[in-house]
């Protein structure tokens, strides 16, 4: 008979990997911000470009990080529920 439900350990490992990926993306976002702000570029184009990074692109990446963390929590919660049902 095929298994129905979650492989709890597999779910927890997946959630951990998703959390790790979110952390790596968060660190990458910080490094990219340093790169974008770290070279000499003066003028209105520079201001607009850097403002676009801060207000749009960086914000999008930050939202992805939050979504990944939320999804990881969802998987962990599902694993906990599966464990309770299985016991």
Describe each model-derived feature in a short phrase.
Residues 1-87:
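N-terminal secretion-targeting helices of virulence/extracellular proteins
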């Amino acid at each position: 008979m095929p298994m129905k439900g979650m492989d709890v350990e597999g779910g927890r490992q997946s959630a951990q990997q998703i959390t790790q990926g979110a952390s790596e993306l968060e660190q990458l976002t910080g490094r990219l911000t340093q790169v974008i702000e770290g070279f000499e570029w003066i003028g209105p184009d520079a201001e607009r470009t850097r403002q676009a990074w801060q207000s749009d692109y960086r914000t999008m990446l930050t939202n992805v990080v939050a979504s990944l963390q939320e999804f990881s929590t969802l998987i962990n919660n599902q694993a906990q529920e599966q464990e309770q049902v299985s016991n």
